[in-house]
């Protein structure tokens, strides 16, 4: 799972440039964070996107909007993203996620970055597993107001920074 920043940035840029959605107004941002992790933001002005979709990561279920680890075996296959409700925006969003997954696998397979990694006997960058879709911050009260104190958070990972932002805590990098 070790991916150099240069490779992560290069693959992200390549995906952003080469992925073409069936909805021509749809754009994608692939932002490398730490190690092998990225955030993927799909945006389109043509329709509101939904967080009510399944994960493509076979090791995690989406239960009540939360990612929950599954008991899994050795071989895992990327799952197709499905709508969790019979609404047009959920179906539309699931379709965009599936288009992203299918195209990104092909793009990474043919990438010059992967050819270079192969020459260096490094593992190939093969897919991006998506989980825990969201289209808005959760509506939670500020922890500072709730407890009438001033809280802060020492953060090291993007998820910790996100939690501190949602709860309106001041964040300090570790």
Briefly describe each language-model feature range.
Residues 1-174:
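Feature captures the catalytic ectodomains and active-site-proximal regions of enzymes
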């Amino acid at each position: 799972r070790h991916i150099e920043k240069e490779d992560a940035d290069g693959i992200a840029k390549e995906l952003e440039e080469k992925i073409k959605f069936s909805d021509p107004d749809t754009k994608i941002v692939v932002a490398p964070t730490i190690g092998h992790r990225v955030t993927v933001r799909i945006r389109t002005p043509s329709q509101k996107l939904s967080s009510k979709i399944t994960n493509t990561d076979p090791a995690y279920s989406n239960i009540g909007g939360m990612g929950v680890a599954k008991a899994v075996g050795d071989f895992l296959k990327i799952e197709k993203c499905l709508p969790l409700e019979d609404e047009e925006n959920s179906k539309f969003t699931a379709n965009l996620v599936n288009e992203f997954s299918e195209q990104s696998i092909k793009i990474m397979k043919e990438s010059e970055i992967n050819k270079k990694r192969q020459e260096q006997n490094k593992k190939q960058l093969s897919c991006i597993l998506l989980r825990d879709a969201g289209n808005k911050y959760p509506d939670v009260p500020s922890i500072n107001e709730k407890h009438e104190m001033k809280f802060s958070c020492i953060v090291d990972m993007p998820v910790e920074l996100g939690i501190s932002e949602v709860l309106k805590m001041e964040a300090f990098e570790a």
